Each structure stands twice: as C-alpha cells, then as structure tokens.
C-alpha cells in the first residue's frame, strides 16, 4: 500500500508538471477522476455542487483502491454535507477496484493456473458488477436520508 501511494504521488507529479505546461494549476489524477465521475455522483444523489469532489472519491476507489479513497474522504469530510458523506461512504464500501483483478488472478489463479486468462477477463465484469452494487446501495442510502 505504501509503494502504491508513492506511485500515485509520482503520477500526480507528472500530471501536474504536464498541466503546468498548459496553464492548468493543481492538475492531478484525483481532479481528473473527479470530473470523469461527477455525473455518476450526481446521478446517485450527490448535490451538483459537491459532485466533482464525490466523483473524485468514487474514481479513486475504482482506479486506485478504497483505502486511498477513504483516506481522502477523512481529510475533506468537514467540507461536505451529511447527505454527501453518507452517499460517498456507501459508494466506497466495496472491494471492486482494478487492483482486485490482480488479487483474483493470484488467489484463484493459483488453484486453476490454466484458467488465469478467464479470471482476468471476468475480473473486469466483476469490478463493474461490484461497483454498480455499491452505487445502488449509496443511492438507496441517499434516498432514505431525504425522506
């Protein structure tokens, strides 16, 4: 996890360096993910004013892992509304991220080495299904908070 966080810092440094060439201050992987996943956050019930922040957390959970996303959430929790905190917390509670494919291949692939290709192919579908399940739970939680 420590090496992974260091790799994220390296990628953020490179993205920030390239962003400075084009006059974009504070460009990072998290900010890019925020804009990509902002519509998803808005669809699941996050107020639009906080959608980029929530989208960044959801993107971090999918692309990086849930530990990094929860760490980021704890740093900015005081700036978010209670509804957004609840929705984001539910959307981050899951193991559906890209690094999970490697864990699946390593764990299950050891029991069936000839099926590693199939496991890798199904891993992407498992990430999508797991993410949709988390987002559905987050949507229901957000809906129940408005009642």
Regions found by a protein language model. Name each.
Residues 1-77:
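Transmembrane helical segments that form the transport core of multi-pass membrane transport proteins
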Residues 61-147:
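C-terminal transmembrane helix pair
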């Amino acid at each position: 996890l420590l090496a992974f966080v260091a790799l994220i810092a390296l990628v953020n440094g490179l993205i920030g360096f390239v962003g400075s060439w084009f006059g974009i201050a504070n460009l990072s992987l998290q900010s890019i993910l925020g804009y990509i996943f902002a519509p998803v956050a808005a669809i699941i019930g996050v107020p639009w004013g906080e959608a980029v922040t929530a989208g960044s957390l959801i993107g971090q959970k999918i692309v990086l892992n849930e530990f990094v996303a929860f760490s980021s959430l704890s740093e900015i929790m005081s700036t978010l509304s209670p509804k957004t905190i609840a929705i984001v917390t539910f959307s981050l509670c899951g193991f559906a991220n890209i690094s999970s494919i490697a864990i699946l291949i390593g764990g299950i692939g050891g029991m069936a080495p000839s099926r590693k290709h199939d496991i890798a192919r199904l891993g992407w579908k498992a990430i999508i299904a797991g993410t949709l399940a988390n987002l559905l739970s987050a949507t229901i939680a957000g809906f129940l908070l408005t009642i």
